[in-house]
């Protein structure tokens, strides 16, 4: 079993901005070198790299740019933000099996000044592959942006659970409260109120502007090695207690509308069941969580799928500041993708590490285990760190 075999020993990042002024390759190299410095390692110690299929920087290009030599392991993982925790899982599997000694997971993009994921891309319906076929079912009906695609599920969830726009807003308020205290966050010093959320414009009903993650230029990198080697390095090792991927039946990318139920994220439920089984833990053992928050409704649904509360009960679970620092389950203490930066979930993994190191700007008392999730609405992944 993978649990306890590998550890995160370094985290690194660029600044988070709306216009980096650098190439995506330079961003990747900067983050990788920053993470290695944090770990007390050099580029020549690295023999593995892993990233997203959506990343424009190949492993060999990053290796050249960062001064990394021979690679015995390299991989790319599909499904956008769903790959985030899986990059760490693959790195952990590589070092646990002896395929590599030190693996760096990275994600870099100019997602605001360059390719913007929220724009309509009609070319996706023209691809002569399975992606083109899938998109041809949803695009003609106006479901052509991530916000519109999530709005369909959010509306059904509201109907069945009784959740309201104000419940979604509670996630945004909590994230921005945490970001306001984080000098690295784009929205540092800029908290919001629930009234601000309710007054923000519609993007795709029932999603308002403040239900949607920001767009960011930047990069994050994570260094993974064996638990044995980690004990001799610079930082307190953060052990990978569990790591999982999940794809549910009848799965699509953001448009899984043909299942018996439209108000859940069963792929995240599958990830959760694996995480609890691998780690031997339960939701009650987790002191803080980093839940992928590209759109607020999916944060509520994740709480249910992961077992923190029953189906349809997330609106009550999060009430009265329960997901803020000092509450029963603080989430996204860095500010999340709504408040800190949208780096496809990789910055959330880094925050999990900081909580366990005791270096988070919004520390949660007595942290022993942190749950982190990757992108939702797609085949996804998750981690428990300790």
Swiss-Prot record:
SUPFAM superfamilies: Thiolase-like. Its EC number is 4.1.3.-. Pfam families: Thiolase_C_1 (PF22691), Thiolase_N (PF00108). InterPro entries: Thiolase (IPR002155), Thiolase-like (IPR016039), Thiolase_C_2 (IPR055140), Thiolase_N (IPR020616). The keyword Kinase does not apply. It comes from the Bacteria. It catalyses: 17-hydroxy-3-oxochol-4-en-22-oyl-CoA = androst-4-ene-3,17-dione + propanoyl-CoA. This is 17-hydroxy-3-oxo-4-pregnene-20-carboxyl-CoA lyase. The active site is at residues 292, 342. Homodimer. Interacts with the ChsH1/ChsH2 hydratase via the DUF35 C-terminal region of ChsH2 (ChsH2-DUF35). The ChsH1-ChsH2-Ltp2 protein complex is composed of two protomers that form a heterohexameric structure through the Ltp2 dimerization interface.
């Amino acid at each position: 079993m993978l649990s306890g075999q590998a550890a995160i020993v370094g985290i690194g990042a660029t600044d988070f901005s709306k216009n980096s002024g650098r190439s995506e390759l330079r961003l990747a190299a900067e983050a990788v070198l920053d993470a290695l410095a944090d770990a007390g390692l050099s580029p020549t110690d690295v023999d593995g790299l892993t990233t997203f299929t959506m990343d424009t920087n190949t492993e060999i290009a990053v290796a050249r740019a960062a001064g990394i030599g021979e690679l015995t392991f390299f991989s790319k993982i599909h499904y956008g933000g769903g790959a985030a925790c899986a990059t760490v899982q693959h790195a952990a599997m590589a070092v646990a099996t002896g395929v590599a000694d030190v693996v760096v997971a990275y994600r870099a993009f100019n997602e605001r000044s360059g390719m913007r994921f929220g724009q309509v891309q009609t070319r996706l319906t023209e691809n002569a592959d399975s992606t083109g076929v899938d998109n041809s079912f949803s695009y003609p009906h106006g479901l052509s942006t991530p916000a519109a695609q999530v709005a369909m599920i959010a509306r059904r969830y509201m109907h069945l659970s009784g959740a309201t726009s104000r419940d979604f807003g509670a996630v945004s308020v909590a994230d921005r409260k945490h970001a306001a205290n984080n000098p690295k966050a784009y929205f540092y010093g800029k908290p919001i109120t629930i009234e601000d959320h309710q007054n923000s414009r519609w993007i795709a009903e029932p999603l308002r502007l403040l239900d949607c993650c920001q767009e960011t230029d930047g990069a994050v990198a994570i260094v993974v090695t064996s638990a044995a080697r980690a004990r001799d390095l610079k930082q307190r090792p953060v052990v990978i207690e569990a790591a999982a991927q999940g794809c549910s039946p009848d799965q699509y990318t953001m448009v899984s509308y043909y299942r018996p139920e439209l108000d859940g994220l069963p792929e995240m439920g599958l990830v959760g069941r694996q995480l609890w089984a691998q780690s031997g833990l339960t939701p009650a053992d987790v002191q803080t969580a980093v839940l992928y928050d590209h759109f607020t409704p999916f944060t509520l649904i994740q709480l249910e799928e992961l077992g923190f509360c029953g189906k349809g009960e997330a609106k009550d679970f999060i009430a009265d500041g329960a997901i803020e620092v000092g509450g029963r389950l603080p989430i996204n203490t860095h500010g999340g993708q709504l408040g800190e930066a949208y780096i496809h979930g990789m910055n959330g993994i880094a925050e999990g590490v900081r909580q366990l190191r005791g270096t988070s700007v919004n520390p949660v008392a007595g942290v022993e285990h942190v749950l982190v999730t990757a992108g939702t609405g797609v085949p996804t992944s998750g981690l428990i760190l300790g």
